[in-house]
Regions:
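Beta-strand-centric surfaces of beta-sandwich/beta-rich domains
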Residues: 1-120
Length: 120
């Protein structure tokens, strides 16, 4: 039986609540699904802050994907390589030295593959 595939563009936005490391996470990939990211993009709309770390999070374990040591304010940083995010995992991006009320954006573009026996 063929896999069912849906194209997705998943935008996320968060306002940092206190000074320190700001973190934004995607939703966890649902059971029976795999998210194939063809592009992952991050920005801090508010200001130039500390280093950006992009990773895949699976429970308490993280797998690093990219690192940007000196990002500019309100500039998109993209990870253009195809990345498979399995069920239960999520994409996470952290930025050091954020201040309260910084606005962080994360956008995932790609497609979702469904197991043949999973209803959408």
């Amino acid at each position: 039986m063929a896999k069912i595939i849906d194209s997705v563009r998943l935008p996320y936005s968060v306002i940092v609540s206190a000074s320190g490391t700001g973190t934004i996470r995607s939703d966890r990939v649902k059971t029976g699904q795999m998210l194939v990211c063809q592009s992952i993009a991050f920005r801090n709309q508010t200001g130039a802050r500390g280093a950006i770390t992009l990773q895949i999070k699976q429970s308490a374990v993280t797998y690093p994907l990219a690192y940007e040591p000196a990002p500019a304010a309100n500039e998109w940083y993209t990870y253009p390589y195809e990345q498979h995010v399995n069920e239960g995992e999520q994409v996470e991006c952290s930025q050091a030295s954020c201040i309260a009320d910084d606005v962080l954006d994360l956008v995932l573009i790609g497609y979702v593959e469904y197991k043949a026996d999973v209803k959408r």
